[in-house]
């Protein structure tokens, strides 16, 4: 296995921890994309209160800019205007913990125009350049081959069964867009790497090294913080469709793939494991590749984004597992991360102290029985931190 290059101060030195209680997580209703699935109305136009009144005039304080070498990378967020302030907290966390040191750009995408308020608040928070884009209508609508009456009946039935976001149109558009179109937006053309950020997330630990440079130097193409199992009722035929694609295009499957992460029986069935895509750092050429492009187009034509409720997380995860060399997938175990309802928190005390983490290791989900990260470590023969068994839950 190739040696991972990382600054010496960040190398894990695992020490045995005492027995810790693990919080049992039962809430599954907040899975990926929750913020964008909610109905919303545009925020009112921004009132220029900061430039009026008793002579007070707002001006952005320009902080010293990082002048060292940087990768062609950006943060990217799909967000509605109404989620501005829950996103602002996410941006502040990312800036404080990481980006204030490196000043990477931030791309914001929406299916409608961003308000002046949204642009003013986010540009004041981001240390890099902010860019705002509207999603093309063809990437946020029913494609011509979809039977909309059939799709509406499916939504009705899934809603009656109380399947998460089963009756949502916007959630389906979001999943389809994140699966196959965000990286095609013209604003993404300037970049080779991205870090996806959503509203209401938090980074628990300082990140003092450039994660994009880390990915490039260590030949990684996809990285995650949390893995979990998908809600099976949302993807009943996703794996059947994937198998048909694999049988039709065996030449596109990487010879050193990670099929054993997503299937326990050599591809006969899907074990529901996926990387939680509300946090992902990846090379854009993974999604731009002929292999993934063919896979997404095949899925899209089958209609499962609308006739079922296929999520972008399992689609991305299966794509990464099939089309990458398994060594190109990385787990960021030193990046403490939170998205309702799960925490990723380093259980190694030395890492938490060195990185000024503010998380409770007893709430770490990484090694929980419902997480798939233990499987990721096992199949790749990676060393696990001391005391990980105490966090199985």
Curated annotation (Swiss-Prot):
The keyword Membrane applies. Keywords: Glycoprotein, Glycosyltransferase, Golgi apparatus, Manganese, Membrane, Signal-anchor, Transferase, Transmembrane, Transmembrane helix. GO terms for molecular function: alpha-1,2-mannosyltransferase activity. Its cofactor is Mn(2+). The active site is at 280 (nucleophile). The keyword Transferase applies. N-glycosylated. Residues 35-68 are annotated as: Stem region. Residues 35-393 are lumenal. Glycans are attached at residue 120. Residues 1-16 are cytoplasmic. It comes from the Eukaryota. It is found in: Golgi apparatus membrane. GO terms for biological process: cell wall mannoprotein biosynthetic process; protein N-linked glycosylation; protein O-linked glycosylation. Pathway: Protein modification; protein glycosylation. The chain crosses the membrane at residues 17-34. It is a single-pass type II membrane protein. Its EC number is 2.4.1.-. It holds the Pfam family Glyco_transf_15. One of its GO terms (cellular component) is Golgi membrane. Residues 69-393 are annotated as: Catalytic. Present with 5480 molecules/cell in log phase SD medium. Mannosyltransferase that transfers a mannose residue from GDP-mannose to a range of acceptors in vitro, forming an alpha-(1->2)-D-mannosyl-D-mannose linkage. Belongs to the glycosyltransferase 15 family. This is Alpha-1,2 mannosyltransferase KTR1.
């Amino acid at each position: 296995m190739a040696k991972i290059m990382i600054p010496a101060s960040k190398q894990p030195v695992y020490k045995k921890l005492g027995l810790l209680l693990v919080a049992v997580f039962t809430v599954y209703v907040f899975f990926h994309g929750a913020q964008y699935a909610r109905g919303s109305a545009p925020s009112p136009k921004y009132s220029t209160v900061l430039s009026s009144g008793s002579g007070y005039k707002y001006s952005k304080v320009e902080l010293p800019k990082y002048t060292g070498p940087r990768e062609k990378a950006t943060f990217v967020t799909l967000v509605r205007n109404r989620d501005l302030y829950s996103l602002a907290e996410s941006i502040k966390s990312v800036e404080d913990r990481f980006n204030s040191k490196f000043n990477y750009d931030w791309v914001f995408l929406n299916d409608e125009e961003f308000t002046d308020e949204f642009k003013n608040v986010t540009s004041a928070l981001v240390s890099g350049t902010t860019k705002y884009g509207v999603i093309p209508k063809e990437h946020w609508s029913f494609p011509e081959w979809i039977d909309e009456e059939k799709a509406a009946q499916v939504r009705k039935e899934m809603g009656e069964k109380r399947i998460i976001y089963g009756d949502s149109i916007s959630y389906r558009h979001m999943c389809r867009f994140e699966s196959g179109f965000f990286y095609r937006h013209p604003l993404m053309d300037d970049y080779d790497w991205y870090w996806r950020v959503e509203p209401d997330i938090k980074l628990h630990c300082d990140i003092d090294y450039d994660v994009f440079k880390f990915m490039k130097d260590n030949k990684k193409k996809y990285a995650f913080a949390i893995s979990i199992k998908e809600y099976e009722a949302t993807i009943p035929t996703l794996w059947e469709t994937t198998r048909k694609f694999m049988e039709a295009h065996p030449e596109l499957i990487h010879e050193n793939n990670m099929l054993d992460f997503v299937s326990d029986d050599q591809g006969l069935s899907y074990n529901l494991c996926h990387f939680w895509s509300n946090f992902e750092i990846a090379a854009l050429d993974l999604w731009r590749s002929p292999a993934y492009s063919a896979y997404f187009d095949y899925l899209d034509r089958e209609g499962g984004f609308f006739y079922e409720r296929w999520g972008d997380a399992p689609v991305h995860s299966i794509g990464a597992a099939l089309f990458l060399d398994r060594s190109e997938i990385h787990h960021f175990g030193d990046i403490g991360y939170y998205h309702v309802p799960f925490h990723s928190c380093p259980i190694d005390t030395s890492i938490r102290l060195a990185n000024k983490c503010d998380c409770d290791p007893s709430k770490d989900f990484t090694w929980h029985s419902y997480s798939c990260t233990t499987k990721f470590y096992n199949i790749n023969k990676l060393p696990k931190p001391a005391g990980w068994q105490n966090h199985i839950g």
